[in-house]
């Protein structure tokens, strides 16, 4: 075997030895260094290498980024430190975000909590039902005043209707006067009144409210069909208070209706014209206006405004005409004066002209 062949054989053996060692220690940088060191040693004259070199890898541990150091033991017994050129990869600087695990635990409500909520709701309803209503407070306040009739509080639906009263369609508003009469006001404006002896609202009598164009604005005609023992009747109309009195009795201060809440007071006067029997005119302060009356009032105001505007326009035109006439007269006077001055000037010229000659 020639010298070149031996060198190639030694190089291949050393390369195989170094590659097996580096693969076991995860360092690929040792192969090139060992091969170069072995080739340099073969060039010195050592031809036969009967045994393989022992390679041991030791980490430097000096810190991050420092190359690894490999200890190579040659067959002659010498130990050589070989430093790897290829550096080990650094760990990633980017840190993965910390994921927090949240556990959601649902606590099922027990039957005891549901029962306690039901009991609380019942107690709350009882407390609200025990509160006095505004009708009860109004009756307590008006009990000392004899002129104010008491308003009975409407019974709840739970109490039910008495067995001796037949079920019927009751109007929206039911009132009871101080004489014990029931007064019902339907949605259409019909007033119904019942005597104290009748059962409940079965003996209601129909009363009609009509508006007439003959009375002054704000007056309301109330027609009733029945009378009480003393010849007078009292009932309430929603939004106002009306006291109806017979023609034969005189009007006394006690017959004045007392206002309760936001209900204004009205004074009843005996009719001065020939009205039918049982018809009384109630003079209101202007709060009882039907939609037709409101429309008529708006039309009347509009016509009055237009009439005032027409009168103002006529007056303005008249003043302008007078001013123009005054100016024309002044112009005429000035023209006459101008003519006179011209004539005087001519006469003066005639008088002065011979002297100049």
Swiss-Prot record:
- Residues in domain KID? 101-160
Q: Which PROSITE patterns match?
A: BZIP, BZIP_BASIC, KID
Gene Ontology MF: a single term = DNA binding
Its domain of life?
Eukaryota
Instruction: Please state every residue range assigned to the domain named bZIP.
Output: 299-357
Keyword annotations:
Activator, DNA-binding, Nucleus, Phosphoprotein, Repressor, Transcription, Transcription regulation, Ubl conjugation
Tissue/organ expression:
Isoform Tau is expressed in testis germ cells. CREM-theta1- and CREM-theta2-containing isoforms are expressed in testis.
Encoding gene (name):
Crem
Q: Name one GO cellular component term.
A: ATF4-CREB1 transcription factor complex
Q: Name one Pfam family in it.
A: bZIP_1
Q: Where's it mainly located?
A: nucleus
Q: How does it assemble?
A: Binds DNA as a dimer. Interacts with CDC34. Interacts with FHL5. Isoform delta forms a heterodimer with CREB3L4. May interact with TSSK4.
Annotated organism of origin: Rattus norvegicus
Q: What does this protein do?
A: Transcriptional regulator that binds the cAMP response element (CRE), a sequence present in many viral and cellular promoters. Isoforms are either transcriptional activators or repressors. Isoform Delta is an activator. Plays a role in spermatogenesis and is involved in spermatid maturation. Binding of isoform Tau (activator) to CRE is increased by CREB3L4. The CREM isoform Tau-CREB3L4 heterodimer functions through CRE and may recruit HIRA to CRE to regulate histone exchange.
For this chain's UniProt record, which GO biological process terms are given? cAMP-mediated signaling; fatty acid metabolic process; glucose metabolic process; glycosphingolipid metabolic process; negative regulation of transcription by RNA polymerase II; positive regulation of transcription by RNA polymerase II; regulation of DNA-templated transcription; regulation of transcription by RNA polymerase II
The UniProt PTM text for this protein says: Stimulated by phosphorylation. Phosphorylated on Ser-116 by TSSK4 in vitro. Ubiquitinated by CDC34 and RAD6B in order to be degraded by the proteasome.
Q: Where is this region: Basic motif?
A: 300-325
Cross-referenced InterPro entries: bZIP, bZIP_sf, CREB1-like_pKID, Leuzip_CREB
Q: Which portions of the sequence form the region Leucine-zipper?
A: 327-348
Provide the positions where the record notes the PTM Phosphoserine.
116, 142, 284, 287, 290
- Where is the protein situated, by its record's location annotation? Nucleus
Please state which protein family the record places this protein in.
Answer: Belongs to the bZIP family.
UniProt name for this protein: cAMP-responsive element modulator
């Amino acid at each position: 075997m020639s010298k070149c062949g031996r060198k190639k054989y030694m190089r291949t053996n050393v390369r195989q030895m170094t590659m097996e060692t580096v693969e076991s220690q995860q360092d690929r940088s040792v192969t090139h260094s060992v091969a170069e060191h072995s080739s340099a040693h073969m060039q010195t004259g050592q031809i036969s290498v009967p045994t393989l070199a022992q390679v041991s890898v030791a980490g430097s541990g000096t810190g991050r980024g420092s190359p690894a150091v490999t200890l190579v033991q040659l067959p002659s017994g010498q130990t050589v430190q070989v430093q790897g050129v290829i550096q080990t990869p650094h760990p990633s600087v980017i840190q993965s975000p910390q994921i927090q695990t949240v556990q959601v635990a649902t606590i099922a409500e027990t039957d005891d909590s549901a029962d306690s909520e039901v009991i609380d709701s019942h107690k709350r309803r009882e407390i609200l039902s025990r509160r006095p209503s505004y009708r009860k407070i109004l009756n307590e306040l008006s009990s000392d005043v004899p002129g104010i009739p008491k308003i009975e509080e409407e019974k709840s639906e739970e109490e039910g209707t008495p067995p001796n009263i037949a079920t019927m369609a009751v109007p929206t508003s039911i009132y009871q006067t101080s004489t014990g009469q029931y007064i019902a006001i339907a949605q259409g404006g019909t007033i119904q009144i019942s005597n104290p002896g009748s059962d409940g609202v079965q003996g209601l009598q129909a009363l009609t409210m009509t508006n007439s164009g003959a009375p002054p604005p704000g007056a309301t005609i109330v027609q009733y069909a029945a009378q009480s023992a003393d010849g007078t009747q009292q009932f309430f109309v929603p939004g106002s208070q009306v006291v109806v009195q017979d023609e034969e009795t005189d009007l006394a201060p006690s017959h004045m209706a007392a206002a309760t809440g936001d209900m204004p007071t009205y004074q009843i006067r005996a009719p001065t014209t020939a009205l039918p029997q049982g018809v009384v005119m109630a003079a209101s302060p202007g709060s009882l206006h039907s939609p037709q009356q409101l429309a008529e009032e708006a039309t009347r105001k509009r016509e009055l405004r237009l009439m005032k505007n027409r009168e103002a326009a006529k007056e303005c035109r008249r003043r302008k005409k007078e001013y123009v006439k005054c100016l024309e007269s002044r112009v005429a006077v000035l023209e006459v004066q101008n003519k006179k001055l011209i004539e005087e000037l001519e006469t003066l010229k005639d008088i002065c002209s011979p002297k100049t000659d």
